[in-house]
A protein has these predicted regions:
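DnaQ-like (DEDDh/DEDDy) 3′-5′ exonuclease domain used for proofreading
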Residues: 1-111
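Metal-dependent phosphoesterase core characteristic of DEDDh/y 3'-5' exonuclease domains
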Residues: 36-46, 114-223
Length: 223
């Protein structure tokens, strides 16, 4: 018991990323007009689950799994996180965007101590929050964010834009949402000066990891 009490137990960090349907306009997180078509979650051991609106057959799921595991195998940083176990790779289909978002906020987020993303404040989390406001209305949306909290309470996630404008978005208490881009901008001095704050540039220079290359269009990718 003494060892347990004095052990350094760090909360597990899960990373998330969303994709929206393709349109002629770039998705605006403040308006959240386009449908959210997928939400990806990656655990600390590189296990991955994707929630999506596209039905995939067994062959497509296996191809998705193979490509992901191959990417890990070819990246030393990802292999180190993976350890000796093979990561789980799952895809869960949802009939509607509403059902997918409701599950994410009310079932998934409450189980996660720290949910992290790249540019998560300005895009992913802000988009998800404004999207549920649009789909469910203010009252039900706030109720979903409360359910995302293990104590049933909300807080304000805030940041400043380059012009000094303060932005606030509701988030769950005790389910921490963090933005790696904000952390890098404020606290990292090793890679400066930055040529770009894109995830691909920072990851390639920090841990020698690149995004999976795709030669087709986004429309083709979502088919």
């Amino acid at each position: 018991i003494n060892d347990i009490l004095h052990a350094q137990n760090f909360p597990k960090i899960y990373t998330f990323d969303i994709e929206t349907e393709i349109s002629d306009e770039f998705p605006d997180p403040e308006k959240a007009e386009q449908k959210v078509v997928s939400i990806s979650l990656v655990g600390p051991d590189m296990s991955c689950i994707v929630y999506g609106l596209k039905q995939m057959n067994t062959e497509q799921k296996e191809l998705f799994k193979t490509r992901y595991l191959d990417w890990i195998e070819n990246n030393p940083f990802a292999k180190k996180l993976r350890g000796n176990k093979t990561p789980k790779v799952l895809y869960e289909y949802f009939e509607s965007e509403e059902k997918m978002l409701e599950r994410f906020f009310t079932v998934i987020v409450p189980k996660i101590a720290i949910l992290a993303g790249w540019n998560a404040y300005r895009f992913d989390w802000q988009y998800l929050v404004n999207r549920i406001f649009k789909l469910f209305g203010k009252g039900m949306a706030y109720n979903m964010i409360r359910k995302a909290s293990p104590i049933g309470e909300t807080k304000q996630i805030s940041w400043k834009e380059q012009d000094g404008t303060s932005v606030r978005v509701p988030g769950p208490c005790h389910s921490e949402i963090i933005d790696y881009m904000e952390i890098v901008k404020q606290y990292d001095y090793i890679l400066r000066p930055y040529e770009s704050y894109s995830l691909d540039w920072v990851a390639s220079h920090a841990v020698d990891a690149n995004k999976i290359k795709y030669e087709g269009t986004l429309q083709q990718l979502q088919r």
